[in-house]
UniProtKB/Swiss-Prot annotation:
PANTHER family: CROSSOVER JUNCTION ENDODEOXYRIBONUCLEASE RUVC. This is Crossover junction endodeoxyribonuclease RuvC. GO terms for biological process: DNA recombination; DNA repair. It catalyses: Endonucleolytic cleavage at a junction such as a reciprocal single-stranded crossover between two homologous DNA duplexes (Holliday junction). PROSITE patterns: RUVC. The gene is ruvC. It comes from Shewanella sediminis (strain HAW-EB3). The active site is at residues 8, 67, 139. Transmembrane segments: none annotated. Mg(2+) 1 binds at residues 8, 139. Its cofactor is Mg(2+).
Length: 173
């Protein structure tokens, strides 16, 4: 049994999703968003760090997965996103959690079956996979998608008999 915390970082809204994995089955434990105030960036980064730290204390995950930074057209946005990721990753490493990262394409492929899926498709498939009564909010659905992607990737590595190592899917430790 393992508990996975997935995070979809953002400087304004950071989504999180927590699933429990037993064998090949995934169970929804919780999800939501860390909404930062419209203060200066350093304060927003602290809110992300504190929020992720609290979620870790609450759910006691065994593993942490986060979406990789994509190259945005706006360099300032990409830098802020990278800093938000950093705040979340530091919270995970402070709790001695292994950290894995996945691209948006990997996440969409794992959840929907195509790397070019729309947000609404990710929301729908997360709802179906986790048997939720309603589709989660977009940022929370993306974070749950990160956790689901990590679970599927981990299962694939186990099926390979350990031939692939953790670096294959961007794990830090």
């Amino acid at each position: 049994m393992s508990i996975i915390l997935g995070v979809d970082p953002g400087s304004r809204i950071t989504g999180y999703g927590v699933i429990q994995c037993i064998g090949r089955h995934q169970t929804y434990l919780g999800s939501g968003c860390i909404r930062t105030a419209s203060d200066d960036l350093p304060y927003r980064l602290k809110q992300i760090f504190d929020g992720v730290s609290e979620i870790i204390r609450q759910y006691q995950p065994d593993e942490f997965a986060i979406e990789r930074v994509f190259m945005a057209k706006n360099a300032d946005s990409a830098l802020k996103l990278g800093q938000a990721r950093g705040a979340a990753i530091v919270a995970a490493t402070n709790a001695d959690l292994p950290v894995a990262e996945y691209s948006a394409t990997q996440i969409k492929s794992a959840v929907v079956g195509t790397g070019k899926a729309q947000k609404s498709q990710v929301q729908h498939m997360v709802q179906q996979i986790l048997k939720l009564p309603a589709a989660p909010q977009a940022d929370a659905a993306d974070a749950l998608g990160v956790a689901i992607c990590h679970f599927h990737t981990s299962q694939s590595l186990i099926a390979l008999g350990g031939r692939a190592n953790a670096r294959t899917y961007g794990r830090y430790r």
